[in-house]
Amino acid sequence: MNVFSKKVIISFILIVMGLTFVACTSSDKTKEKNLKRSQDTEFASDSGVRIEKLSEVQQKNLHTLAKVWGFTKYRHPEITAGNVNWDAELFRVIPKVLEATTKEEAGDIMATWLNQFPFQVNTLSKEQEDLYHQVKEKVYLDVEYSWIKNRQVLGNNLADYLENLSEVKVTDNDNGYAVFEEGDIVNVSSDSFMDNSINYEDTGMRLLGLFRYWNIIEYFYPYKNLMDEDWDQVLYDKIPELALQGDKESYVLSIANLTTYIHDSHGFFNDNFKVLQQHFGAYKAKASIFNIDGQIVIAGREDKSPLKVGDIVVAIDGTTIEKIIEECNKYISVSDKNRFTNAFDYYLLRSTKEIAEIEVIRNGEKLSLNVPCYYNSKYDVKRLGQDEKSCFMGDKKIGYINIATLESGDLDKLMKKFKGTEGLIIDARFDNVKMSEYLKFINYPIGEYIKPKVSEYQQFYSSNSFEPGKFIKSTSNSSGRGFIAEQLDKGIDSTTFSKIFDNGIIRTSLGKVKDRYQYNGKVIILMNECTQSVLETMVMSFMDAPNATVIGTPSAGANGNIMDITLPGCIQTSISGLAVTYMDGSQTQRIGLKPDITVKQTVKGIAEGKDEVIEKAIELITKPESK
């Protein structure tokens, strides 16, 4: 299927596909078993590649091989058809490349290897040709691969092969390693060879982890232009590290470090053996933190903990908190190193012991506390205000909606109560884990209330399926009064539409839209660095509401869908799969959304149990002259 051939519920596709990825996993594995490439099992348990020493020539040749392997992987017709196990082919050619004593010899080896896979440059149909030229006019980001013409490095034979391959336009990738799905979404879940445990002494498997991840970023990461480091240099520098360190911990930590170079708070990392978790300590205090200008402040804790809300953490088991934050930055990807509450919360309060010595500052006094910690703790400690129920505020003059505690069907009941109030506070500072599907759609019905007309608020940029590595201007997202009915009027199947929204937004198999009134009071949206991903989308959708004001601090700066990646050794990580900007093209990734009015929570306020951001919101509604 061509990426641009079908558009279903386009305005919702980013969100819908985000829900679909998990459901697709088992079916993808079933399909994989039926592909020709799955029959090549020679290296299923071991690549047979071992490297004890690595010369500069070998490092350079492996660097070239990684790029050649990746460029071919996403373009060659036999590979995109699912007929060639390209991971296995990597293991077949690595030993030969390692034996080469010059770049010229390595280039000839790679050319001979690739010539086993001949191809013809395809001719597009009239429909495909028209579509291709339409796509070319929408280019947003272009991969740089002039290196395929560098004959001094590659040699004539290899350069000829790659240049010829660059003329191929990918028109069918349903069975490839990167499948283009509806909504221009790229799914790489089928690229999961050796997703189980590996022999960590196996150099080939370790290099596969590096090469796979590097090339996924090279060709399918829409924010490559926002990376600080030279991605090509990162590959070169990482080769000795992955080639020579032959144990589980060094491999997992090296891959974790690799993911930080994309600077993306969607870059979640998990290894089934909990290596990263163990690195910071197997035991965790049952407490949550909040970052206030670089200070780690306790924002919630279990009742029996000697920690108190408002404590400033100074050190844990003798290691300064600054050193621990530095270590987190080394292994955990964040869009902005100064906004890390979401990403680091799980790792900061860890210890190798059941009782951690945590130094804090409380009311200006330094204290040393013996804090109970729990092994592999799946803690659920709410931050100040996170579990606040939606309610009336300010003598029932203000309606307060906490997105984090909304349940299915709540919104319309609340808005019925809040009709006629002077103002509405929408709190988008906390994620709603239990009701994630509801949360992902909630901005649409809210928009029906607070936006008198439909407006676009978010522009998407997606991969060009014809030419891997190129990104194009894609669809936009809209919300506002009449938007849901507008989608039904476009002929979208009402049963399917209602099924998707059967979570309190639409509750009829006929697709009938709820009758929602126009809310005319002031609207204050609360935001901070914990406002991430779908919450950022929500805030963006409300920004142009006529009576809306966004207050708080900048958001996390990680927007777009999440693309899951599997790497050898039971490693799962992810990236943002679509680029997102404001409608005028202004950047949101890494820098976050900017509030209209900056309001910061203070350490003193947290210690006293005050929510200073809500206090300011109430003031803005009840005392308009203070705005």
Where are each of the predicted segments found?
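N-terminal mature-domain "stem" immediately C-terminal to a signal peptide or N-terminal signal-anchor/transmembrane
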Residues: K31-L98
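Extended, small/polar residue-biased N-terminal targeting/export presequences
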Residues: T64, T80-D87, F91, P95-D191, ...
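PDZ/PDZ-like domain segments forming the peptide/carboxylate-binding groove
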Residues: V57-Q58, H63-G70, E137-V179, V186, ...
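C-terminal motif of bacterial Sec signal peptides marking the signal peptidase cleavage site
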Residues: V22-A23
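C-terminal, low-ordered peptide segments at domain boundaries
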Residues: Y140-E167, E302-D303, K308-T421, G592-Q601
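Conserved PDZ fold ligand-binding element
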Residues: V68, T72-H76, Y213, P306-R339, ...
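Bacterial N-terminal signal peptides that target proteins for export
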Residues: N2-I10
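Cleft-lining beta-strand/loop regions that shape enzyme active-site pockets
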Residues: F43, V57, K73, G82, ...
